[in-house]
Amino acid sequence: KRLLQNLGIEINQVIPEGGFVEDLQNLPKAWFNFVPYREIGLMTAVYLEKEFGMPYVSITPMGIVDTAECIRQIQKHINELAVVSLEETVDYEPYIYQQTKFV
């Protein structure tokens, strides 16, 4: 959650954390799905991509390389949708640089 919040991304749902069955109807409102642990939720993300065209990111943000790649995948999906919906694109490279420059 903290990574997404640091990037300024509003979280639609965290499933199954505190969720109700009624909340599932809001899943298609998300721009993409984030599956930080492939063992949990990947099949659901694949289904949502197939049924609703919702892309997903399934890279676990652990370690410098994977965290940077995860953020770049998030950026890619947001920017693809931003072009279609005439929203602003995002550039998370400064964030990645800031988080890794002293490592």
UniProtKB/Swiss-Prot annotation:
Its main location: plastid. It is found in: Plastid, Chloroplast. Keywords: 4Fe-4S, ATP-binding, Chlorophyll biosynthesis, Chloroplast, Iron, Iron-sulfur, Metal-binding, Nucleotide-binding, Oxidoreductase, Photosynthesis, Plastid. Its cofactor is [4Fe-4S] cluster. One of its GO terms (biological process) is light-independent chlorophyll biosynthetic process. SUPFAM superfamilies: Helical backbone' metal receptor. GO terms for molecular function: 4 iron, 4 sulfur cluster binding; ATP binding; metal ion binding; oxidoreductase activity. GO terms for cellular component: chloroplast. It catalyses: chlorophyllide a + oxidized 2[4Fe-4S]-[ferredoxin] + 2 ADP + 2 phosphate = protochlorophyllide a + reduced 2[4Fe-4S]-[ferredoxin] + 2 ATP + 2 H2O. Belongs to the ChlB/BchB/BchZ family. PANTHER family: LIGHT-INDEPENDENT PROTOCHLOROPHYLLIDE REDUCTASE SUBUNIT B. This is Light-independent protochlorophyllide reductase subunit B. The gene is chlB.
